[in-house]
Amino acid sequence: MAKSGQARVPSPTERRHLFEVIQEHRHPEKNTAIMQISFKLGLRVQEIALLEFKEICRLGRVKKCAVRDFELHQVITLPASYTKGANALGRSKTKYERKTVSFSVDEFDRIVRQIENLALANADINPANFYPDVKQHKGKSRDLPLIDAELRKALTDYLVLRLEQKTSVKPGDPLFVTQKGGPYSPNTLQEHMALMLRDWAGIEKASSHSGRRALITDVIHKQKKSVKVAQKIAGHVNPSTTIIYEEPPEEEISEALNNIS
């Protein structure tokens, strides 16, 4: 079961309902492709937002009065820069706001003494001056096979539609665009994915991270693959991050409670 603050893993029934209800709203091809990538490849929301055509397919030549053809790749290669978020390409317009900070005991004692000295000197004290530096996420490139049939169909349907609407797209153009035609920022896509999961499909406590958690949990618990395999799929630099997903999923806990003798 997800810890407080963690995205909920939808059940198979909830997942089927999600893809059914997506068809009842605008832009079903795009939204289906986004959610299939989330559930079948486990990409982070910022990685989905930063995807470009060249990561997904090889575009054919532009032809007059003809729909542009394409060929889906067999493997998607995610650059390490994608895992660092939108700032890698300057798409994020939202200033980073820190929610928590942590110190060692020695560091905390040192800061307290500094604040005491400033207070005795009647100097201005700005808490932000004492925050530790923000740790920069290193990022890690990874290759993920595009072999799932439903995923490939969703991508094909969406690409056909995009190329019908605009044949002159370039390999470096964003794969997913908003209604206004611009690229998604991670924050905007995060909100949109949460809208589909919670409001459209009614999946309680779901978020843009639910598809990723569902995939990694499935790899570890149902497929019984090693943490190393799950780590590779997730793109975690440290295996300790992947270990979090070794917690039993909600459905196993529910089954255990239901079978009490």
Which positions does each model-derived feature cover?
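Basic, Lys/Arg- and aromatic-enriched nucleic-acid-binding interface segment
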Residues: P12-L41, V45
